[in-house]
Amino acid sequence: MLEVALKLLEEITACGFKAYIVGGFVRDYILGINSNDIDITTSATPKDIKEIFEDSCLPSEDYGSVTVIMKGIRFEITTFRKEIGYIDNRRPAEIKYIDDLYEDLLRRDFTINTICMDEEGKIVDLLNGQEDLKNGVIRTVGVSKERFEEDVLRILRAVRFATILDFRLDSEVIDAIKDTRELLRGLSYNRKKEELDKIFGSSNANKGVELLLGLGLDKYLELDNLSKVKCTSSLIGVWTVLDVLDKYPFSANERELITACKEALNYNNLDPYTLYRFGLYANSVAGEINGYDIKEITETYNNLIIQAKKDIDITSKDIMDALGRGPGSYLKEIYGDIERQILSGRVVNEKSRILEYICSKY
C-alpha cells in the first residue's frame, strides 16, 4: 500500500506540485503499527488532481478533498489550506487554498499527526512531532484551548490517542480540556459514539475510562455509569453497563445485544436455563461483568441438553394432537415449561417422555 501511495506522490510532484503522506499513517509507520488508511496533502487543487488522475472522484470540492483510486486502493487527497473561523465548535466557516505545507500543518490537531512523508519515503517533520512520539506525549499544535474551541471533537481524539498509544496528555492539553469540556454537550451523539467506541474497544480501555473520569468528561458525555464500568473483552459489555440506549445511537443489532446482556446481568450466568434463554454471547458478556469464569460459562453452555427451541424433540403439532386442541397462546406456556424441565433434567428430551409429561400435567 505504501509503495502505491509513493507512486501517487511521484505523479503529483512530477506535475510541479508538492505532495506528502500526512497524519496517522506516518505516525503509525514510525511506531511500527500497521495502518491501512493513508491521507495525502498537496499544493495541487482539487481541479489539478482531477486533471492528473482521470479516475478520481470529487465528492466535496468545498472542503478541498478528492478521492483517488490507484490499483484498487482509495486515497484521500486534500489541498494545503488555511481554515478561517469555525462553526458550532466543529467545522471551518471558510477554507482558503495555500501553497505552504508548514501553514497547512498549523491547522491540525496534534503534533504527532503532523509528521509527513515525501515521495522518496523520507520523513518531513516541521513541528517536532517525532519528539513527542518518542516521549509519548499528546500535545496540540499551537494553543490547546484554541484547538479545542475550534473543534470540540479533538477533546475525545486526545483521549483516544492517549488510550490507544498509551501516551500521556500534555499538561496544557489537560488544562484546556477542563476549560472547554462543556462544549461536548453540543457535539452530536453520533460523533461522540464513534470516538467512544474506539476508546472502549481498545485493548487499553481501562486507561481511557480513567482519563474520561479524571478529566470530568463523564458529566458532559452523559455517561452517568462510567465509574461502574468494568472493561471487558467486549465493547458491548461496556455499553451494557453505561445503559445509554435512550441517548446514544446504536444499530438494531447492537440494541438487541445490549438489551440481552443487560437482562442477563440480573441472573446467574452459569444457570442452564439462563444460558439457554439468553445464549452464550450475552451470558459471556454479562458473566465477565459479574465476575464469572468465561471458560466455565462456555463449557456449561456447550454441555446443555438443548441450546435452542429447535433442539426439543417435539413440535407444536405433536402437542396439539396429544391434547386435542388447536393453536393458541397455551403453546408458548407449555414450551416454556418443557424447556425448564428438560434443562433441569426432570424430563428426558425424547418425544414419548415429553408427551407423557404434557398429558399428565395439561
Region annotations inferred by a language model:
Residues M1-Y362:
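Catalytic cores of the polymerase beta-like nucleotidyltransferase superfamily
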